[in-house]
Amino acid sequence: MKHSVHFGAGNIGRGFIGEILFKNGFHIDFVDVNNQIIHALNEKGKYEIEIAQKGQSRIEVTNVAGINSKEHPEQVIEAIQKTDIITTAIGPNILPFIAELLAKGIEARRVAGNTQALDVMACENMIGGSQFLYQEVKKYLSPEGLTFADNYIGFPNAAVDRIVPTQSHEDSLFVMVEPFNEWVVETKRLKNPDLRLEDVHYEEDLEPFIERKLFSVNSGHATSAYIGAHYGAKTILEALQNPNIKSRIESVLAEIRSLLIAKWNFDKKELENYHKVIIERFENPFIVDEVSRVARTPIRKLGYNERFIRPIRELKELSLSYKNLLKTVGYAFDYRDVNDEESIRLGELLAKQSVKDVVIQVTGLDDQELIERIVEYI
């Protein structure tokens, strides 16, 4: 049986990446620091996924195990030494924390003489996630390890899309997911092109697909959350049921469409349909997707290369409209949740410093016109 190592045994790891790996005949070693989840994976060796749609079918994922990377890093290194593929779904901010362990696993493959080509795919909500991870891993590799990695270890970027809401079940491994899923991998950085996963799309140039996903799904989702929170909505579905909010989301997506068409020459009708499907996904009545989940970590989401500021910058360069995105940025700066550290920190920054200084600090912008326009909406 083929073997995989997946970092992140959370809902997305189990409910999306795990499902695809299982369907492709892999044994999956889930790596995490959540001892409850790891114990359950080892005790049961399987878990169930429910598809949130009419009829709500279930999928049983088997041939799984768990490794606590904090307690047993040597087991992770051993698993990496023999594995056929590595994936992650841990969040962009956590990637640097697994880099040293990955590097040790790569060194172990080198010492063992395992020259089977291996690809490491960071399945995260970020542009260039796998290459970012590679830069972190390189910090811990020996000169020999670097040469080995250059020859045998690929870090192809990936774009992933599936809504997996925050949830709590009596069975800690059970997870509910939306029917839609999309996983796209770039081919030009694959070291093992013969290993092709079914239900995964492969593209020579991934950037248009990553930007289509991040600027459409992530920007649209976050827009739903920040405007929804402003109007008191507790779930994304509740936000979309407000015609005023839905209209604003559609206006943001229209601006995103103008950017994607101008930059990547996407077909207008196909993109309109893609955005229509996104709205329908947000309106899925079988999913309870809390505004607090989608809106969390606003400082990260207001970053220079993130889902709002990057498209705004590029729309401005193309002399295209971005006023609805600007309004959403204003709502994001205003978002507060006592359970979200970043939103609280954002409030503290705004209380201590001028709004302009906070905008510069959080967004990384130096375009004075853009900075002033954002300030107007806060």
Swiss-Prot record:
The keyword Oxidoreductase applies. Keywords: NAD, Oxidoreductase. One of its GO terms (cellular component) is cytosol. It is an enzyme of class 1 (oxidoreductase). It holds the Pfam family Mannitol_dh_C. It catalyses: D-mannitol 1-phosphate + NAD(+) = beta-D-fructose 6-phosphate + NADH + H(+). Its EC number is 1.1.1.17. NAD(+) binds at S4, V5, H6, F7, G8, A9, G10, N11, I12, G13, R14, G15. InterPro entries: 6-PGluconate_DH-like_C_sf, 6PGD_dom2, Mannitol_1_phos_5_DH, Mannitol_DH, Mannitol_DH_C, Mannitol_DH_CS, Mannitol_DH_N, NAD(P)-bd_dom_sf. GO terms for molecular function: mannitol-1-phosphate 5-dehydrogenase activity. GO terms for biological process: mannitol catabolic process. Belongs to the mannitol dehydrogenase family. This is Mannitol-1-phosphate 5-dehydrogenase. It comes from Streptococcus pneumoniae (strain ATCC 700669 / Spain 23F-1). The gene is mtlD.
